[in-house]
């Protein structure tokens, strides 16, 4: 049976790149577009939420979210994502990739819309319902990580597998960029329709009641691309590797792949479903798994964990860093819509110049340079640029040096995406056995989200000024932006060291990497 299985799958490994591969990239990629849009668009509207729901007419500064509310709004979706990665990763191996794949998209669509419809008679009610729906939004997003990566890896040929998985993940960059463009468009329209004075001129009128629609429209827009691809996602057949290696139905796998690849794949009549090699039936918590893949799983979880502390803290709190260096004007000198526009413009510029190009550089070079070198170099360059920003921080905050700061800051994002942010997603979908692939990817991704939660909650407090008089309302003094950036640089360096635990999958079949090809070799 092993030879038949590998014979069927060899057709996938050597298949020429064709239309169906690109169709799969678009179908899976649109899920990731929505993932990134929904996770990161909240950073564009948190200051607006503070102005609307926590306005204090006696304060010289516009309203801001209290520390616990800001932490919840920024972090609750990440908590949901972590849970979803573990649950749907496990379910994808138990029930099959296709059966679970549509469910994650439905959750993302419904909860995106529901988040924008958050309600309540007072601020607490609105924030509570928003956090509730964003948790379940994150739960659906979490399922998309292991399923999209696993499906794309199992459909791809071995020559361009890395580029295909990276292309799916690169849609995350497009989603981040789209969030910025949507926020720019919506805030511009509302500014023309409902002009308002700055906060310094008139505190109450600086936030017209109509701006409450701005954040709701921005949040709900993420449901649109996901809804457009739902039909096509449900039409995708189960992956041949799951059908053959896990469900043990070679005949069905062959039929599915013949349709997908538009070619005839020969199948011998001898199908011995009852033949099982005990060496290939070890479980996740077995000694055999520990021996074969224990260090690999440690490598994928640790590097993703360390990377996401830095990546998410930087992404979610760009607005705070830009405000600290003076690239975004002081809040009191703007009205509510102007502030959304300025934050969106800054984040869009970073995404356009560094985040998005980084993703596509990975797509272009991953199957020539290899995953290991890209990840190692990415962590190294992130460390270098983070320290280059942090140690002379007082130099960068001078008005004449702000452009230099933005360039250096952009380069850390470029090498995150042409580096570990992409490779930590790709490698776990390649190196584990088919029956545990989705589960192990989910575990690796969940470790990453644990890091993201630390980044989201920790950086919020850590980046506060060391001077009590300069901290944001409700926060204790922190270690400051400079020291926070130094900590992130150290974490990037540690991530570089843990990269040595991760194998290089370039040019190898999934069965070679997972050890599932060993039975065939032994039988010969």
Swiss-Prot record:
| Residue ranges of the TM segments | 25-45, 71-91, 100-120, 132-152, 162-182, 212-232, 293-313, 349-369, 372-392, 403-423, 442-462, 485-505
Where found in the cell?
Membrane
Instruction: Name its GO BP terms in alphabetical order.
Output: cellular response to phosphate starvation; phosphate ion transport
Its induction, per UniProt? In roots by phosphate starvation.
**What topology does it adopt in the membrane?**
Multi-pass membrane protein
UniProt keyword annotations, A-Z: Membrane, Phosphate transport, Symport, Transmembrane, Transmembrane helix, Transport
Q: Which residues lie on this side of the membrane: Cytoplasmic?
A: 1-24, 92-99, 153-161, 233-292, 370-371, 424-441, 506-524
Molecular function GO labels: phosphate transmembrane transporter activity; symporter activity
Matching InterPro entries: MFS_dom (IPR020846), MFS_sugar_transport-like (IPR005828), MFS_trans_sf (IPR036259), Phos_permease (IPR004738)
Pfam families given for it? Sugar_tr
According to its record, what are the GO cellular component terms?
chloroplast; membrane
Q: What SUPFAM superfamilies does the entry give?
A: MFS general substrate transporter (SSF103473)
Describe tissue expression. Answer: Root specific, especially in trichoblasts. In mature plants, localized in root cortical cells and young lateral roots.
In the record, the note on similarity to other proteins reads: Belongs to the major facilitator superfamily. Phosphate:H(+) symporter (TC 2.A.1.9) family.
What is the additional note? Although related to the sugar transporter family, it does not transport sugars.
- Known function: High-affinity transporter for external inorganic phosphate.
Record protein name field: Probable inorganic phosphate transporter 1-2
């Amino acid at each position: 049976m092993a030879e038949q299985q590998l014979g069927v799958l060899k057709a996938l490994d050597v298949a020429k790149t064709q239309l169906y591969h690109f169709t799969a990239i678009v179908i899976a990629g649109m899920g990731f577009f929505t993932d990134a849009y929904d996770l990161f668009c909240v950073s564009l509207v948190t200051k607006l939420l503070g102005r609307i729901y926590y306005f204090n007419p006696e304060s010289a500064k516009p309203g801001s979210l209290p520390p616990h509310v800001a932490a919840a709004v920024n972090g609750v979706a990440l908590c949901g994502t972590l849970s979803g990665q573990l649950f749907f990763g496990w379910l994808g191996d138990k029930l099959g990739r296709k059966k679970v794949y549509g469910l994650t998209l439905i959750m993302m669509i419904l909860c995106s819309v529901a988040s924008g419809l958050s309600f309540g008679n007072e601020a607490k009610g609105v924030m509570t319902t928003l956090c509730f729906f964003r948790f379940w939004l994150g739960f659906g997003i979490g399922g998309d990580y292991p399923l999209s990566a696993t499906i794309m890896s199992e459909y791809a040929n071995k020559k361009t597998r890395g580029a295909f998985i990276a292309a799916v993940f690169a849609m995350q960059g497009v989603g981040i960029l789209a969030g910025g463009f949507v926020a720019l468009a919506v805030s511009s329209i509302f500014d023309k329709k409902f002009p308002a004075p700055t906060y310094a001129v008139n505190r109450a009128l600086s936030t017209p009641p109509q701006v409450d629609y701005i954040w709701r429209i921005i949040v709900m827009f993420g449901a649109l691309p996901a809804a457009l691809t739902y039909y096509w996602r449900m039409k995708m057949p189960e992956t041949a590797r799951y059908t053959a290696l896990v469900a043990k139905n070679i005949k069905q796998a062959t039929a599915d792949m013949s349709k997908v690849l538009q070619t005839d794949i020969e199948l011998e009549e001898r199908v011995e479903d009852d033949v099982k090699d005990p060496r290939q039936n070890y479980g996740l918590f077995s000694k055999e798994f520990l021996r074969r893949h224990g260090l690999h799983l440690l490598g994928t979880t640790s590097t993703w964990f360390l990377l996401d502390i830095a990546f998410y803290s930087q992404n979610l709190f760009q607005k705070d860093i830009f405000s600290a260096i003076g690239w975004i004007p002081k809040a009191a000198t703007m009205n509510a819509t102007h502030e959304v526009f300025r934050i969106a413009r800054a984040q869009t510029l970073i995404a356009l110049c560094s985040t998005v190009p980084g993703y596509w550089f990975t797509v272009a070079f991953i199957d020539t340079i290899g995953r290991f070198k890209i990840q190692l170099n990415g962590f190294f360059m992130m460390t270098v640029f983070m320290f280059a920003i942090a140690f002379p921080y007082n130099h960068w905050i001078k008005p004449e040096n702000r452009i230099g700061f933005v360039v250096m800051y952009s380069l850390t994002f470029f090498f995150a995406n042409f580096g570990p942010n992409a490779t930590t997603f790709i490698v776990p979908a390649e190196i584990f056995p088919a029956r545990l692939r989705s589960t192990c990817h989910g575990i690796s991704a969940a470790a990453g989200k644990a890091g993201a939660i630390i980044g989201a909650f920790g950086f919020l407090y850590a980046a506060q000024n060391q001077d009590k008089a300069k901290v944001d309302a409700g926060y204790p003094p922190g270690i400051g932006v400079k020291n926070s950036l130094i900590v992130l640089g150290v974490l990037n360096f540690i991530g570089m060291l843990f990269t040595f635990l991760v194998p290089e999958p370039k040019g190898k079949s999934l069965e070679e990497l997972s050890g599932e090809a060993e039975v065939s070799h032994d039988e010969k």
